[in-house]
Amino acid sequence: MNDQDYTQDSGIGAVGWMRSVVIDAHDPVLLAQFWCNVLDVEIVESEADWVQLSPDPGGTFFAFQPSTAPRPESLVARPDIEVTDIDHARDRIIELGGSYVRTIQELKGDHHYVMADPEGNEMCLVQPLPPELARPRWGDQAI
């Protein structure tokens, strides 16, 4: 099935599918390099107005475009990055030039970390979902 067929009528009620997350950046190359290290992916396209990474294991592309617009006071979205060792991942983000923002305590005693990339874009480091809630990873089986 090609992209056009999927977005016209997938049979599952979807309007479309998540192809990429595009982030405005004052320095797109710097942020692309940071996220390459976070997600263990590579830059696959680099133009004056666009830097795109290879897809992560979930199949989503991150891309960065230049922007001189002021940063909004409140973020309306941030990615959740699933990790197996949350404390190691927090430390690694800091080593790569990111920063720790805060810890969020969850209802069942777990926690996750809100982190920021070098330009202040927030992300959450989260622990894996329990098997009954997790969906198959890209490539493991049909989604």
Language model region names:
Residues L39-L75, P118, E122-L129:
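Conserved short beta-strand elements that form part of the metal-binding/catalytic scaffold
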Residues S10, D27-P28, I43, P131:
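Intrinsically disordered, low-complexity regions enriched in Ser/Pro/Gly/Gln/His and often acidic
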Residues L39-E45, E82, V101-E106:
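Short linear motifs in intrinsically disordered
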Residues A32, E73, H88-R90, C124, ...:
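Intrinsically disordered, low-complexity acidic/polar segments
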Residues N2-H26, Q52-L53, T60, A63-F64, T68-R92, I94-I143, ...:
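Vicinal oxygen chelate
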Residues D27-E42, A89-E95:
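Amphipathic alpha-helical segments
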